[in-house]
Design a protein with these regions (language model features):
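Binding-site signature for planar aromatic cofactors or substrates
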Residues: 1-201
Length: 201
């Protein structure tokens, strides 16, 4: 397997004397990208993550993805899946996946007594007819990510936070999802998709 480190990484590792440490971390965590039992439990209790993507020219996007706990599902030791819910219609991150499927997922637990985080990198695919779609009310499609790297990340700079309230905008079964304020703005009402025309808060 090729090294996960590029020339830039190696340059800085040598500059700050961390090459040996980086090689050990590669051997211990990166060489075998398996989602273990602890990783699975961590992923499936989280209600948010950050998604990094880039287009065909390498221009990046980073987006926040939120849902109820368990909205990211571990399908097997190398695959996770999550829904794409209604957004602002720009499809910056999801559009990138159609041009460049390589993604990074940063999953952080801010609220536990000992905050922690997990990185999962992989290759993503989009399916509008995915068998999981029925499990996600109002989801437009399902994204599956085949992991190429799975590893815990140093938690020391994570600020501990409290969850005050889960978003009422997360689609849920037997619950009418409210309309966000911005869809009621005068600049937006005549360009909303047909499914949103006439809806009120």
């Amino acid at each position: 397997m090729s090294s996960p480190y590029n020339r830039g990484s190696r340059h800085l590792q040598d500059r700050f004397d961390t090459r040996r440490l980086a090689d050990r971390l590669d051997e211990k965590f990166l060489a075998n990208p398996v989602i273990g039992a602890e990783d699975r439990a961590f992923i499936e209790r989280m209600e948010m993550f950050f998604l990094a993507t880039a287009d065909a020219e390498g221009r990046p996007q980073c987006s926040y993805k939120g849902g109820d706990p368990g909205f990211v599902r571990v399908l097997d030791e190398r695959t996770v899946a999550f829904p794409n819910y209604d957004g602002n219609g720009m499809y910056l991150s999801m559009g990138n996946l159609l041009e460049n499927p390589h993604v990074g997922m940063l999953i952080i637990d801010f609220t536990s007594a000992r905050p922690s985080r997990l990185r999962l990198c992989g290759v993503a695919s989009i399916a509008e007819s995915d068998s999981l779609l029925a499990a996600y009310p109002e989801a437009q499609f399902v994204v599956r990510v085949r992991a190429t790297q799975v590893f815990p990340n140093c938690p020391r700079y994570i600020h501990r936070m409290d969850l005050v309230e889960r978003s009422p905008f997360v689609p849920r079964a037997d619950h009418e999802t409210p309309v966000p304020d911005w869809k009621q703005a005068s600049w937006a009402h005549d360009v909303l998709p047909a499914r949103d025309q006439g809806r009120e808060r």
